[in-house]
């Protein structure tokens, strides 16, 4: 019985990587890309893996999680990282590329693979057989409609509205208290109480902070239930104290009184190493987020592992819908990859395509599918997007807060990150050796 041909939809970073991994595993691929016949509002060429925003793939050092992620991908023969290394331009400790050379290199590598057939047409139905959907944040309206029918309307989102996520270790626990509003249920939130003076200082900084300019195709993403905190603030001096900063039902146990305003932090991962700022979705520029949110009591030295964003982004509720193998729970032959799974960033998207591609090929060959251990950055991201709270799920980028904590407490952050990086790469090395035995 001959092996099936696998269909990959979308030739962005994730789709190109998935197609490459499948072909490298000896399985035929049919790669569909609607460009140049049908363009998106953000793309300008017909090349694969076109970088539509920055030309930087971020940090390249092993003291940074995304640097470790790149190294994991190198060891798994990633075409995206190989192309980036070949097309790199000087960028200090980051990996930045000549975006035109990079896209051309990926395109040539994938197009010229003997097991890859490229089809330049738009897919408007979810194909039969083994399929990897990697159509990205600007998925076409026709395919979006089919995805909505497949997943259920409540599990497909068209914008990304996320509050900043903070490392728990960087929160000053002497200035916060643990409680739920009106003491309902278990004490689930960290609460940062503010005096009127502290609130006024925060308010003034917030309304004067710089925001990211919206792209034309993002102009209509805001609505009442998802208002940026800075827009809410500009509606009136006390508006936030009746919204996400309302103090009612929260008594500071140290004073026995209600505060003027309270900022709540909600646990964001099962290991309780990450917390998000409740209701603080924002469009502020990143340096301003760091400056303004550091005015919140307890967050003076906060480490933001994922900045708040609001932009156009088609993604699914992966905790409800996907397995850590990137398979759709209700159809084992259907895989998703890229930003639409809820990973955030160029490298993270490619990494998800790498794993989805490996697993799609293994399924075609009748082999057991793989789940990378959570000690790896790739494995921790797959675990996060498939086990996060589905009610509050928002996309996430690579960070050390996703991996299991180091057994002993290490105060030196750089040393701790080096230990976590070494563990991740040892784990990947063991995995690759076992895979080839």
Curated annotation (Swiss-Prot):
- For this protein, what is the EC number? 2.1.1.74
Q: Which cofactor does it need?
A: FAD
What keywords would UniProt list here? Answer: Cytoplasm, FAD, Flavoprotein, Methyltransferase, NAD, NADP, Transferase, tRNA processing
Q: Name one GO biological process term.
A: tRNA wobble uridine modification
Q: What class of enzyme is it?
A: transferase
Localisation per UniProt entry: Cytoplasm
Q: What is its main location?
A: cytoplasm
Determine if NADP is one of this entry's keywords: yes
| Reported function | Catalyzes the folate-dependent formation of 5-methyl-uridine at position 54 (M-5-U54) in all tRNAs.
This chain's protein is named Methylenetetrahydrofolate--tRNA-(uracil-5-)-methyltransferase TrmFO
Q: Which organism is it from?
A: Brevibacillus brevis (strain 47 / JCM 6285 / NBRC 100599)
Which taxonomic lineage does the organism of this UniProt entry have? Answer: Bacteria, Bacillati, Bacillota, Bacilli, Bacillales
